[in-house]
Amino acid sequence: MKEINIRCLVLSTFIVSCLFFENTLSKISFSKVAYINGSIHTFNQDLSIVDSLLVEDGLITKVGPRDLIIDEIDEDTQVIDLNGKMMMPSFHDAHSHPIWDGINQLKCVLTDLYDLQSIKDVLRDCLESELTKSTGWIVGSGLNIGLFPSGNPNKSILDDISKDIPIILWANDGHSGLANSKALELANITSDTKEPLYGVIERDLMTGEPSGTLRESSAINAVLDLAPKDTDVDYDKGLSIAQDMAHSFGITSVLEAAVGERHMAAYKRAAEREELELRVFTCLEYGKTSFAHDASTFEDVYQRLEQFNHERLNVNCVKIFIDGVLEGQTGALLEPYLDSGNIGELILEKDSLNKAVARFDSENRQVHTHAIGDRAVRAALDAYEYALKENGTLDNRHHISHLQMISKVDIPRFSELNVAATFQAAWAMPDEYITGINIPEIGIERVNRMYPIHSVFQSGGLIVGGSDWAVTTMNPFIAIETAMRREDPDGRLKGILNPDERMGLTEMLKAYTINAAYIMHQDHITGSLEVGKFADLIILDKNLYDITPNEISEVRVLETIIEGTTVFKIE
């Protein structure tokens, strides 16, 4: 008991010292930081919960009870009393578009607007903005097309804003857009224009005149390519915005789901300025871009991207689009859409897809596939199975994102093929897209089987978390609550989407920590709080295990730490 009392006295002295110098701590350099008196959830294999943790030179060196840490405290140690607060590993977002959506924040932002009048009010503000005056365009993002019948808004909405200034808006699904008459005129999109490859020009059923709604990038870019190009400064600002937002949500790693050379150059510039405070795992798109079917061109680009690799920046992933989305009926289904008899389209035919996946697998590259419809998910799983038969088991950690629909017979295949399921769990609730578009086009029975997260988990599949920001918020707590409740966290929308697919808290936290770190090939250095790993930590204002599921989306990150350095803090 004496030893314990003496140690407690010494510890108390350090705490008093730290409190006394609270206002000058930022000016003092400590080689060690001791966190004590916390509820520290390690997310190691045993899911241990401890009260203290020691960080030295950015690495975790001790994890356990306070007595284990006290021996290490000296004059070079900063002691932080967590006062019972919850600490856990930082989050890892395994599917996002940080730079692209960061740049979008510089333009006309329509995110979280749920009525036409609010949308028009923001557009009118954008019309009067300095950006529009200097560029002669309104380029916007975040339009909720679920607010419109069949997800097909009309150009007249934008013509009411301006008939002289071209306007092009990305929808918040990332696969649809809306253009006004001026923008369509500049792009020469008329009733005579043929459908673009893998895209759709929505039309008036009577006249064939373009309605203004465009599906997929091949159609949207016909307009967007005419708008002023984003500069390197825009890319740098976009990255800075995205990084700050990520830190505020406790995120220290992102998987950038589709990059080009300009994205990689922006990350590299930030790294060289010592301003890259995220771990970034990047994927180069194959199968849909202008060099999609030209292997030599793809390899040239891939090799150029590899030259940008840095300590926190890595490209070793290939992104393949298998299909589009249900909203434009470009999502590939096993059974037809009810109103058209269409079953969507696979972007790569079976043999080409199988050979591409097998080839990249043999080259030790991760293949990250976009699959929305159940036919697309099956095609992706078939391709991974083909690669497994061709190459044997390799440690490439392939995964499929989105997974809106999965046939019941394919659910066990995730575990059998060791393919991870990267869900955007924030989508797993009855929003305007599901109630206004999906139910009419595929029926309530199929809608009730959407986003079968628990079924994949129960069958042994690895569940991984990703936001697909800015389709939905980057905030992991919103995704986690939605996965647990299958309801709208805001309470704005009513209803539950198949409660049988509800997930537990621990498994969803693992999806955003150790599981996502695994997908990014960095679970050996981060993703859990274990000795020898980087001190990538977050401190929360509430203990997630002490509150009800409907409170989780309200939890705030108090501090985000990467490699022992605080990058976000609420004072």
Where are these regions (language model features)?
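His/Asp/Glu-enriched, well-ordered alpha-helical/loop segment
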Residues: 237, 358-368, 372-398, 402, ...
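Divalent metal-binding segments
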Residues: 28-36, 41, 45-300, 316, ...
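Bacterial N-terminal signal peptides that target proteins for export
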Residues: 2-10
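Bacterial Sec-dependent signal peptides at the C-terminal "C-region" and cleavage site
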Residues: 15-31
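Acidic (Asp/Glu)-rich catalytic clusters
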Residues: 271-274, 304-309, 393, 415-416
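Ligand-binding beta-strand-loop-alpha-helix segment within the catalytic cores
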Residues: 420
